[in-house]
């Protein structure tokens, strides 16, 4: 290859150096390293060429007078600064000339040794040769690159193909080694007619301003770079150099390196950069808890149809007729709110946002996504004022809805996706597929207050007119991952945590990613790929197949910890503004989270992020990786002998045993041997007795006993923190105020409420389902150790309820269920409730529990409530059915998602599942009347027994709930308007007698309530109604032995000896009367009050032989026992002495011989008076006087009878 060709490549490389901004006017700048740190301050790294090195340049070269340099293989000579410092590439002409005469660039060959190694590390080493190199107009000076000396850490061998002039090789010392980044220019994320607008235009004419050609607001597409780290397959790098500095990230295995300038000037001269690392913790257990990602990421589903995330992983998908295309393009509009523009400045905000979008573009280029998805930025809008019809506030859902409506009005007018659209952007801007709002506003999804949410988007909203919207909060370079994550949601990709088969990984759509902590890799999970393909096969993705043609070239292209440069106060000012300072009250936990106090506010605030590594925590210590560690590094040493295994950390249940080793000869400062210093193993003990508190709770209670406040003893309970599973957080009972009491729980403590992993020395040690520490054996979602997940099936569904109040049954989870998870789709003023067959429950009987673990249906159920959001989970298996209910308080749109697994094999016939029986529970059926009409009264709820069966609720007899604890009625104040006057009474005093009847009293006064609520005494005549009683009767019930006897009954006989009875009962409330003192219930008696009775004789014969006659009998009053006559019988009880009798009719033939005329009878019969005076009156009335026999016995009465007859005839 001739000198001319080499010179051409050198010129291209030199131009690139200038564009990257690695030039300075004689300013000393470079890398500064400290061996014990993994954080770097980068002024500019060295640039390499990828092609083969000139063998002749490895040992020296010829002098080039034109360049003012002499060829050589040595160092810089008397360069000032650190031996690892990198000088500016370009110098002023005067300095260049001086240096060319007095200071040769390369002197004598380097001497071997450490000095040689350090000097080589700081050289710029692109390949080149001697010759003149002219920079474009405006460059400070011409420059020729030096030849790279031979060294072990030289770049890899040359590639066979001819390299492109747009390629650069960037060397960055990090992670205790040199990283070589092969970068190519890549501005494909900018659309052909990309424009930057400021709304309104700054200045006297406040209209929309589009940047003119050549304006500083328009980006140069050549300052965006994409590439990889050589010798590291799967790595990714994305950078921007638009402002003269270097900004972007490197992903290398499990490490993330972020690079950005220390300030926002991004000047052309060299200046410090911040390079910091975020690494995924290999010891952190990734759980299925979706509360974490829901806390930081808001996903709004369709209001009219179920969310697409509720899709079983193993089901057979519907085969769509749409075939996947090879490439999809997302035409995007990006809007920066006024707070964002004001915070960064218009120019810096533009550079920062475009750098972020370049990173987002590269995240979607990852091969794990399965299809090529290109981000095309059509327009960047910088808002200096908030439009009148756009809401920007704390309420995230409201802001998302407002932004979608606003962007539709501004950018949504189009005729057809194939046609060009005519708007204020230009004449041929393509249709908008997505709109992104970047804000500095701290928002929350469902409430109007700040919280930790950093992104929100509509699920499956892309291409939709009013749902293709994303809002992301500015959180530094992590903003790129937030936007990529939320754009994934907008394209129908659910959280990995929502898929059981993908919940254990850390990919872009996992819950951990959105927080910007514990980053995994930049790949997309298998579930994300399937969700995206499902969306792309649907009609909803049709807009992604049409794009504006891309006309831009599509060419691929520390010495100090940051906490040493920024104090805790300065870090708080970066997060919360210039009035913020570090909260001194939280000094003891500074490394776990940076707490700041803003002037004028009473409480400290935090964003849950730890301070920068290097921040002072204690004397002689600094924060590093979230822990307060010593500044002086410990020396390495040789391995020593292991100690015997220690005793088990627990006396019951599972614990850990450990052994240690020390390295001889290094004293107390020895830290680690070659290999682990401490080893652990699981030790098993008998199960802990029932009723003992959990191990974490016991540690919290033990702490409270050690405090100097006895009143707080036994008042602490453990609170589990998912971010620090092996730290001891405790909270007062009944309050949600967790306090970090210890950075390490005791060895043997479980890492969480579920799982087998155990904490040892403050770290979560993995344990397999086979009970072995370090084992990789895991249960599948069916609960089978090392199973294949095919022995069960997943049951999932949604519950939506819009009206009603009280308890509503959602479903009955059958016995044998595992992996139970119930999650509210959004926070609501309602409560989840569970009840099993043994009446154990959570949130039943109108009693709301705090977050914690509960034993129901033979398993441990974990109830989590954060604000208004709730979640219930259980590992299972359940032994009895579980009733899932919702306690609704008011009409609202309420929704929740549930899922669990059940065995695939059907149950045996004798174990066939039966329809669960009805569920009875006490409920508050309504409110009673107020007990006062004014002045403040109370109304109570009416507690009734409720039957729940097949989601139907009905009121039943209270006897059905007799075995349940009846809740106290709820009390609500009512009629609180003041009264003019009213009677006020004190409580009744205790009864004057503790046993038996007594009296009790109270004070009664007439009072008047003033406007300020004060009560004063008034005249009794001013109060309405009679004065309430001041004394009342009472009966003491505290009697040790009180028998109460009833009245004796009458004697069982009325004449003679008999028995009488009475009732006897114990009146003691506790029924503890002494039997020996029990009165008699029966006794003998005598009664002679009814000894005289009427005695009757036999009836006589009938008085006649024919016709009507009479019969009589003797009646006498006689004594029952003695037989004596008396007159003590009751006349009302005397029986009848006579009765009529009837014989055959008399012969009507008259015998004159037998007829005696009454007159003759009266004349011939000497009447001596009536013989039967009692009966004669009856004989006369019965017309029997004509019978001589009766006449003779009653002659006197019959004579008068005949006399009257004769008178009547005469």
From Swiss-Prot:
Q: List, alphabetically, the Gene3D superfamilies matched.
A: 2.60.120.830, 3.40.1620.60, Collagenase (Catalytic Domain), Thrombospondin type-1 (TSP1) repeat
| Biased composition, class Polar residues, residue ranges | 130-139
Q: Which GO terms describe its biological process?
A: aortic valve morphogenesis; collagen fibril organization; proteolysis
Q: Motif Cysteine switch residues?
A: 295-302
Query: Where does the signal sequence lie?
Result: 1-30
- Disulfide bond sites: 404-469, 444-451, 463-543, 502-527, 572-596, 583-604, 591-623, 617-628, 648-683, 652-688, 663-673, 991-1034, 995-1039, 1006-1023
Cofactor comment: Binds 1 zinc ion per subunit.
- Enzymatic class: hydrolase
According to the record, what happens upon gene knockout? Homozygous knockout mice are viable, fertile and born in Mendelian ratios. Echocardiographic analysis reveals progressive aortic valve disease, without dysfunction in any of other valves. Valve defects range from aortic regurgitation to severe aortic valve stenosis, or a combination of both. Dysfunctional aortic valves show thickening of the commissures with reduced opening of the valve, occasionally in a 'fish mouth' pattern with only 2 visible commissures, reminiscent of fused bicuspid aortic valves in humans.
Q: What CDD domains does this protein map onto?
A: ZnMc_ADAMTS_like (cd04273)
Cite the record's Pro residues compositional bias ranges: 143-158
> Which segments constitute the Peptidase M12B domain?
328-548
Q: What is this protein called?
A: A disintegrin and metalloproteinase with thrombospondin motifs 19
Species source reads Mus musculus
Question: Which taxonomic lineage does the organism of this UniProt entry have?
Answer: Eukaryota, Metazoa, Chordata, Craniata, Vertebrata
């Amino acid at each position: 290859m001739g000198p001319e060709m080499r010179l051409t490549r050198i010129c291209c490389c030199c131009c690139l150096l200038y564009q990257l901004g690695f030039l300075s006017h004689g300013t000393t700048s470079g890398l500064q390293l400290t061996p014990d740190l993994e954080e770097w301050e980068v002024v500019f790294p060295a640039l390499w060429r990828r092609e083969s090195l000139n063998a002749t340049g490895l040992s020296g070269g010829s002098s080039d007078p034109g360049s003012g340099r002499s060829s050589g293989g040595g160092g810089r000579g008397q360069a000032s600064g650190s031996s690892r410092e990198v000088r500016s590439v370009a110098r002023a002409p005067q300095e260049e000339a001086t240096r060319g005469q007095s200071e040769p660039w390369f002197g004598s060959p380097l001497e071997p040794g450490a000095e040689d190694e350090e000097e080589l590390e700081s050289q710029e080493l692109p390949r080149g040769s001697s010759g003149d190199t002219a920079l474009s107009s405006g460059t400070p000076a011409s420059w020729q690159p030096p030849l790279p000396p031979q060294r072990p850490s030289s770049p890899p061998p040359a590639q066979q193909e001819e390299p492109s002039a747009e390629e650069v090789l960037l060397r960055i010392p990090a992670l205790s080694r040199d990283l070589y980044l092969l970068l190519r220019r890549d501005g494909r994320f900018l659309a052909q007619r990309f424009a930057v607008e400021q709304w309104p235009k700054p200045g006297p004419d406040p209209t929309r301003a589009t940047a003119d050609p050549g304006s500083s607001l328009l980006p140069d597409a050549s300052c965006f770079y994409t590439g990889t780290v050589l010798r590291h397959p799967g790595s990714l790098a994305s950078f921007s150099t638009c402002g003269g500095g270097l900004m972007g990230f490197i992903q290398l295995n499990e490490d993330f390196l972020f690079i950005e300038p220390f300030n926002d000037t991004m000047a052309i001269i060299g200046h410090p950069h911040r390079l910091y690392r975020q690494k995924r913790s290999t010891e952190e257990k990734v759980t299925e808890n979706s509360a974490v990602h829901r806390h930081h990421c808001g996903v709004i589903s369709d209001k009219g149809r179920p969310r697409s995330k509720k899709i079983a992983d193993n089901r057979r998908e519907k085969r769509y007729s749409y075939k996947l295309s090879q490439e999809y393009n997302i035409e995007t509009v990006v809007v920066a709110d006024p707070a964002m523009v004001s915070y960064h400045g218009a120019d810096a905000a533009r550079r920062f946002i475009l750098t972020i979008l370049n990173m987002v573009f590269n995240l979607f280029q990852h091969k794990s996504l399965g299809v090529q998805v290109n981000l095309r930025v059509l327009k960047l809008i910088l808002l200096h004022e908030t439009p009148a019809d756009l809401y920007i506030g704390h309420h995230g859902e409201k802001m998302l809805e407002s932004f979608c409506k606003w962007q539709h009005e501004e950018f949504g007018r189009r005729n057809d996706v194939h046609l060009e659209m005519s708007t204020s952007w230009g004449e041929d801007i393509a249709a908008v597929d997505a709109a992104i709002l970047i804000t500095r506003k701290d928002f929350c999804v469902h409430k109007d207050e700040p919280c930790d949410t950093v992104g929100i988007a509509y699920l499956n909203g892309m291409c939709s007119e009013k749902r293709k919207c994303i809002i992301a909060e500015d959180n530094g370079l992590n903003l790129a991952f937030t936007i990529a994550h939320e754009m994934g949601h907008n394209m129908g990709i659910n959280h990995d945590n929502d898929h059981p088969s993908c919940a254990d990984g850390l990919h872009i759509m996992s819950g951990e990613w959105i927080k910007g902590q514990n980053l995994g890799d930049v790949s997309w999970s298998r579930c994300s790929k399937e969700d995206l393909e499902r969306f792309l096969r649907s009609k909803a993705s049709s807009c992604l197949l049409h794009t504006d043609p891309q006309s831009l070239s599509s060419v691929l292209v520390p010495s100090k910890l940051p906490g040493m440069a920024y104090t805790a106060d300065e870090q708080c000012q970066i997060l919360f503004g210039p009035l913020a300072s570090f909260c001194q009250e939280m000094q003891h936990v500074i490394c776990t989270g940076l707490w700041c106090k803003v002037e004028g506010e009473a409480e400290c605030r935090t964003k849950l992020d730890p301070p920068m590594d290097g921040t002072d925590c204690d004397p002689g210590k600094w924060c590093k990786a979230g822990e307060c560690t010593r500044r002086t590094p410990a020396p390495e040493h040789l391995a020593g002998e292991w100690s015997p295994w220690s005793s088990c950390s627990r006396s019951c249940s599972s614990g850990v045993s450990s052994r240690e080793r020390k390295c001889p000869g290094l004293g107390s400062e020895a830290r680690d041997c070659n290999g682990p210093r401490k080893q652990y193993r699981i030790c098993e003990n008998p199960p802990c007795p029932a009723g003992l508190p959990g191990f974490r709770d016991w540690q919290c209670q033990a702490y409270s006993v050690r405090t100097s406040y006895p009143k707080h003893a036994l008042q602490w309970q453990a609170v589990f923190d998912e971010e620090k599973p092996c730290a001891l957080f405790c909270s007062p009972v009944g309050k949600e105020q967790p306090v970090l009491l210890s950075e390490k729980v005791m060895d043997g403590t479980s890492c969480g409420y579920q799982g087998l992993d155990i904490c040892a020395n403050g770290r979560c040690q993995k344990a397999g389902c086979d009970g072995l520490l370090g084992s990789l054996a895991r249960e599948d979602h069916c609960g089978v150790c090392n199973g294949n997940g095919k022995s069960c099936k997943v049951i999932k569904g949604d519950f939506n309820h819009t009206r009603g109040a009280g308890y509503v049954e959602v479903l009955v989870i059958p016995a044998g269920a595992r992996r139970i998870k119930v999650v509210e789709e959004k926070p609501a003023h309602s409560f989840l409730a569970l009840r099993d067959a043994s009446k154990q429950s959570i949130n039943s009987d109108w009693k709301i529990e705090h977050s914690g673990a509960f034993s129901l249906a033979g398993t441990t159920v974990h109830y989590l409530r954060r604000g208004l959001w709730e979640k219930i989970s259980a590992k299972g298996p359940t032994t009895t059915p579980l009733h899932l209910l919702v306690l609704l308080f008011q009409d609202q749109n309420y929704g929740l998602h549930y899922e669990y697994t059940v065995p695939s094999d059907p149950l045996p016939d004798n174990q066939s599942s039966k329809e669960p029986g009805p569920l009875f529970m006490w409920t508050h059926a309504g409110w009673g009347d107020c007990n006062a009409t004014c002045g403040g009264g109370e109304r109570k709820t009416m507690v009734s027994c409720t039957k729940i069966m097949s989601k139907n609720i009905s009121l039943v007899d209270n006897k059905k709930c007799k075995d349940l604890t009846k809740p106290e009625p709820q009390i609500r104040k009512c009629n609180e308007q003041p009264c003019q006057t009213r009677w006020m009474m004190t409580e009744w005093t205790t009864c004057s007698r503790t046993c038996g009847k007594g009296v009790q009293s109270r004070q009664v006064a007439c009072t008047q309530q003033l406007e300020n609520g004060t009560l004063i005494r008034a005249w009794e005549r001013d109060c309405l109604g009679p004065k309430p009683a001041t004394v009342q009767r009472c009966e003491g019930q505290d009697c040790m032995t009180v028998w109460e006897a009833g009245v004796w009954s009458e004697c069982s006989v009325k004449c003679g000896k008999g028995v009488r009875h009475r009732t006897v009962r114990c009146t003691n409330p506790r029924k503890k009367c002494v039997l020996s003192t029990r009165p008699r219930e029966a006794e003998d008696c005598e009664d002679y009050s009814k000894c005289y009775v009427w005695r009757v004789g036999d009836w006589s014969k009938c008085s006649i032989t024919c016709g009507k006659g009479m019969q009589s009998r003797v009646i006498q009053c006689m004594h029952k026992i003695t037989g004596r006559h008396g007159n003590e019988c009751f006349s009302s009880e005397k029986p009848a002495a006579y009765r009529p009798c009837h014989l055959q009719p008399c012969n009507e033939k008259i015998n004159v011989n037998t007829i005696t005329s009454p007159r003759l009878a009266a004349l011939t019969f000497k009447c001596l008076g009536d013989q039967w005076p009692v009966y004669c009156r009856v004989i006369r009335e019965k017309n029997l006087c004509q019978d001589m026999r009766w006449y003779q016995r009653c002659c006197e009465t019959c004579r008068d009878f005949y006399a009257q007859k004769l008178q009547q005839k005469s």
